[in-house]
């Protein structure tokens, strides 16, 4: 947790430096001196909220004295993973008006992006409810946003696949081509990686599936296969490896796919295609 917070803070500071640069000219022009103020955080769309602590951290990095007071819902303070509705007050931010103005865009960028991913993930996860199939994300994330985007997937009810390349072995088409075949790639991975390291292999046809099973792959990804081809592949695997389907996954065919008994469904769309959730800071005013 400590290292995650350090990584998070490093990226937030980079984002603030990117946006503010040497100074916030507009704010310094209209607010040359300290004045205490408050502003209201409002949801402008129904969805799942995620990134509240990141939103808060943007302001406290700029000024540790900034207060972010999260609203209550049903007697409990609002938290990541909660459903929010259009017009709902999410928080009040109190502090130096210059900080509220300069941090606004960066704080909202994180909160809108993360809440959009959580909302999109939640909608897809609802289609898997009642099944044993787990929904996974991918590494198709925005550079320097992975820690935030993968967190948002979890907040929306999904699960994280590999966080980075050192987490597990995944042999994709180019790895297999470079090694000289499925069996050879698996053999080389077994010899190189720790014995506790899972080996996943991406397959595109039934011959590759057979080769991966016989070579002892732990997880076999069925990439861009039709439901009919997946059914054949699952018969071949016959429980000897975990199964993951990826590519060509739509709301229309996901129910058919889960009925095949696949263990995992992975979708890059959770992070690369989720629209933002509309959230804004409104009604900024000075207070005594």
Q: For the regions a protein language model found, what residue spans apply to each?
A:
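Acidic/glycine-rich phosphate/pyrophosphate-binding loops and surrounding catalytic core
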Residues: 3, 8-215, 219, 228-236, ...
